[in-house]
Amino acid sequence: MNNYLVNIDDPVLNGGQKAKNDITRFLTEDGFKELNIPIVIHPEDKSLGAQIRKFKDGLITIPKAIKKIKDADNIVFQYPIYSTFIMNKLIPAIKKNTHANLIIVIHDVESIRMFQDGGYQQDEMNILNAADLIISHNQFMTDWLNQQHVNAKIVNLNLFDYYNPQQLNTNNSFDKSVVFAGNLAKSEF
């Protein structure tokens, strides 16, 4: 099988990128080929230059890149990428230029996390409904997606883990340890 992982560059290297990097690592170790699309997304940049770049990327860069993997059987994409415009160009390019199954691995659902207005939520659910398969964190997320009328097949990961190259130390005492799985910069403590 020809399995591909499509990646979009993320200029903001925060804790959210760690999970995506780990999925990339695990899938490439399992034989997936990477297709890195050279798009830099700065969600806060609303300048004319940024809008022109986004337009060019959506109409030229993405279709050109996707045409390189016409032989794909499965394409995995890690969601979100923080640009609805780019997502709305990427998914149709995959559907038009390949016969691959589109598998979306969800890291965050922005409608839950930040944008709770109906318009954004509907756009996000349309994106997710374009998938042939969604990999969700757990049953709670899956139930929420089903309540929002996401009809794609959903599989629960049921485990959220990071790659750690360190040898497991079984002699540690965890009497006063704190383990925080999140972005410290966004935390209020």
For the regions a language model picked out, list residue spans one by one.
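A short, histidine- and acid-enriched strand-loop-helix "catalytic/donor-clamping" loop
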Residues: 102-118
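Alpha-helix capping/helix-boundary segments
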Residues: 82, 140-142, 185
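Membrane-proximal helix-turn-helix segments that form the acceptor-binding/catalytic region
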Residues: 66-70, 92-101, 117-134
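Donor nucleotide-sugar binding/catalytic pocket of nucleotide-sugar-dependent glycosyltransferases
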Residues: 132-146, 150-167
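N-terminal pre-catalytic "stem/leader" segment of glycosyltransferase-like enzymes
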Residues: 1-89, 95-101
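Short hydrophobic "strand-cap" motifs at the C-terminus of beta-strands
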Residues: 8, 137, 180-183
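Conserved catalytic-core segment of nucleotide-activated headgroup transferases in glycan assembly
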Residues: 170-189
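Helix N-cap/beta->alpha junction signal
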Residues: 16, 79, 108, 138-139
